[in-house]
From Swiss-Prot:
Name of the protein in its database record: Methylenetetrahydrofolate--tRNA-(uracil-5-)-methyltransferase TrmFO
Coiled coil: none
InterPro entries for this protein: FAD/NAD-bd_sf, MnmG-rel, MnmG-rel_CS, MnmG_N, TrmFO
Family: Belongs to the MnmG family. TrmFO subfamily.
Origin organism lineage: Bacteria, Bacillati, Bacillota, Bacilli, Lactobacillales
């Protein structure tokens, strides 16, 4: 598609991603038409008409550079993020986390955007994708059905999902490899799964813990269609003692290897039950627990899933979640700049791209906004280094395995590994990754 000749850029949606995108475009001297339907049409989850409203929590999570989201926030500060700047101005005490007065914060973001001379705020619902100008779509996880259909169509009728059913993801380096074995079911293809075998006694204890664990409460806007399309592992377990044995914990075709020396039931060659772990990123540093989408509270997930042999000390880089969510098959549909592969004048940002979390959503809006502005000015696209948090997140969501793609929080597992011998002390390793990230970001910005 040819370059747009319009004298402005559209941004649809004034949540965290859309607000950030609009600001980044306007600060580069380009007029913005910012559309927001709240004020004309309410949503089930928002309480106000303010921009960048925080719906479920007032926390932007950890602020330390030894925390991946802390690193991402520092990178965003260096990129003049409107979300970070107004968040800082409205901070409330929260220990090592960054929490904000959500009303004061949202009002200040709204006021800054509404008073910006290059931003025209239009309170209206958009049901068609504009084709008059470069457009950033940032309509959030509960995109209206009408617009969702248009996004579905513009992407060839593929790759727009309505339920986020994500299994937990763990750091491979924290798996006890002496208790697991590499094998694919029936030895089909290459050995692609790490298998965590259970004896009958281990399975029964695990089943009891799983069926009695505390679930997270549902939001009112998630209840109606919550169980369509997928089933939480705890619900499956409650349907019968053996239900999981015919589902994600099926042991058939996963015989013990000849050199296996761990516990087993008598002389059986096959475990009573098996939990499979599947590689989640190209670097092989992250693995997800296959079929374990769940709505347990995070503390309960840690307690129960660490009963799985080999995962006793596992670190969870993302806990399982289940909620209604509209997100795209970004690996097939988007470039690393969040542009549509089929229409480069169309960009997406926010949770619909497969990033998970307030900070991550704002970061995606920052990347999309910068690149929309560069596209408008006919400048080369800006792809941040994979050694940075703000570079690794777009890279992950646009390069993940499409077949198993699920929304992702920022974490050190998706950032390019350090060169040289692995630093064993985790805090020192994360400090080194953060130091390299900020240096590489500064170098990138200096070259612009």
């Amino acid at each position: 598609m040819s370059q747009s000749t319009a004298t402005y850029i559209n941004v649809i949606g004034a949540g965290l991603a859309g607000s950030e995108a609009a600001y980044q475009i306007a600060k580069r001297g380009i007029p913005v038409k910012l559309y927001e339907m709240r004020g004309v049409k309410a949503t089930p989850q928002h309480k106000t008409t303010n921009f960048a409203e925080l719906v479920c929590s007032n926390s932007f999570r950890g602020d330390s550079l030894t925390n991946a989201v802390g690193l991402l926030k520092e990178e965003m500060r260096r990129l003049d993020s409107i979300i970070m700047r107004n968040g800082e101005a409205n901070r409330v005490p929260a220990g090592g986390a960054m929490a904000v007065d959500r009303e004061g914060y949202a009002k200040s973001v709204t006021a800054e955007l509404e008073n910006h001379p290059l931003i025209e705020v239009i309170r209206d619902e958009i049901t068609e994708i504009p084709n008059d100008a470069i457009t950033v779509i940032a309509t959030g996880p509960l995109t209206s059905d009408a617009l969702a259909e248009k996004i579905h169509a513009v992407n060839g009728g593929d790759g727009f999902y309505f339920y986020d059913a994500a299994a937990p993801i763990i750091d491979k380096s924290t798996i006890d490899m002496s208790k697991v074995y590499l094998k694919s079911r029936y030895d089909k293809g290459e050995a692609a799964y790490l298998n965590c075998p259970m004896t009958k006694e281990e399975f029964m204890a695990f089943h009891e813990a799983l069926t009695t664990a505390e679930e997270a409460p549902l939001n009112s806007f998630e209840k109606e269609k919550y169980f369509e399309g997928c089933m939480p592992i705890e619900v499956m377990a409650k349907r019968g003692i053996k239900t999981m044995l015919y589902g994600p914990m099926k042991p058939v075709g996963l015989e013990y290897p000849d050199d296996y020396t761990g516990p087993r039931d008598g002389e059986f060659k096959t475990p009573y039950a098996v939990v499979q772990l599947r590689q989640d990123n190209a670097a092989g540093s992250l693995y997800n627990i296959v079929g374990f989408q769940t709505h347990l509270k995070w503390g309960e997930q840690k307690r129960v899933f660490q009963m799985i042999p080999g995962l006793e000390n596992a670190e969870f880089v993302r806990y399982g979640v289940m909620h209604r969510n509209s997100y795209m098959d970004s690996p097939n549909l988007l470039t690393e700049t969040f542009q549509s592969r089929s229409n480069p004048n169309l960009l997406f940002a926010g949770q619909m791209t497969g990033v998970e979390g307030y900070v991550e959503s704002a970061a995606s809006g920052l990347v999309a906004g910068i690149n929309a502005a560069r596209l408008f000015k006919r400048e080369e696209a800006l792809i941040f280094p994979q050694t940075t948090a703000i570079g690794s997140l777009p890279h992950y969501v646009t390069h993940a395995d499409s077949k198993h793609f699920q929304p992702m929080n920022v974490n050190f597992g998706i950032i390019k590994e350090l060169e040289g011998p692995r630093i064993r002390d985790k805090k020192e390793r994360y400090e080194a990754i953060a130091s390299r990230a900020l240096a590489d970001l500064d170098t990138c910005l200096a070259s612009l």
